[in-house]
Amino acid sequence: MVAPSQFKQLEKVGNGTYATVYKGLNKTTGVYVALKEVKLDSEEGTPSTAIREISLMKELKHDNIVRLFDVIHTENKLTLVFEFMDNDLKKFMDNRNKGNSHKGLEMDLVKYFQWQLLQGVAFCHENRILHRDLKPQNLLINNRGQLKLGDFGLARAFGIPVNTFSSEVVTLWYRAPDVLMGSRNYCTSIDIWSCGCILAEMIMGKPLFPGSNDEEQLKLIFDTMGTPVEQTWPQVTQLAKYNPLLPPHMPRDLKQLLQNNTEEVLDDNVVDLLHGLLQLNPDARLSAKDALNHPWFAEYNHAN
């Protein structure tokens, strides 16, 4: 543990789901850091599981994961010291959209960001860690164009909150249909669904499934991807929140949907990858490793 006095707190840079984030300066090294302050319940203190999970994060060292340098534990707060990143994917896309109604990113950039996202996710899954809350706000970007997963492990350490003490609304837009229908079998496939939603959003410049509650979220998903049935998703009807009165929908043409929202001509490979990430049945979704070996990433795989 380092002394809090080693860091100088600079301007506030945001409210996260769990914490307030400040830009900070390591007075010893002169390096900028992000100081994430988690207020602790004075009666309950810090859950030991949270400390354990956060300690695990310190061991996650990968180019596409934001480094957690240290944890400072004082009586009423926990300060997590992260590497400082200049931007996040949501702000990056919003800035590109200024003056435009909706405009996706250039496909070369989409591919570069998606490759980095999947690299980070694959590394975490290999280490048996789920993110559970992947969304553009949690994908941090530095001025060299490196994309890194942020808030890794925090969703597990503190639970995904239903309501938060910050102005940020916990979004359902990237949440997998199995989770929305009450599945308790959280596994790596929930992060893969989120990766698919993020890929579509980078292409279109707007969220693929912008629902405002669980029910509407599922409706939007099934309207586009088709209504699940036992043949394509065994035991879907056993899920706690499965609705037997769901109107049957056939899957829509995903390529057409994306193409209508982008000026670039999409190749079939990116659409095929998206189908692999957005399988309704979690067991049918690609793994992060398989996704990285997809033909859409051929140029990256040949370069390595």
Swiss-Prot record:
GO molecular function: ATP binding; cyclin-dependent protein serine/threonine kinase activity; protein serine kinase activity
Subunit structure: Interacts with a number of cyclins.
Protein name, per record: Negative regulator of the PHO system
Binding site for ATP: V13, G14, N15, G16, T17, Y18, A19, T20, V21, K36
PROSITE patterns (UniProt xref): PROTEIN_KINASE_ATP, PROTEIN_KINASE_DOM, PROTEIN_KINASE_ST
Function according to Swiss-Prot or TrEMBL: When phosphate concentrations are high it phosphorylates the PHO4 transcription factor thus establishing repression.
Record family assignment: Belongs to the protein kinase superfamily. CMGC Ser/Thr protein kinase family. CDC2/CDKX subfamily.
Keywords: ATP-binding, Kinase, Nucleotide-binding, Serine/threonine-protein kinase, Transferase
Species this protein is from: Kluyveromyces lactis (strain ATCC 8585 / CBS 2359 / DSM 70799 / NBRC 1267 / NRRL Y-1140 / WM37)
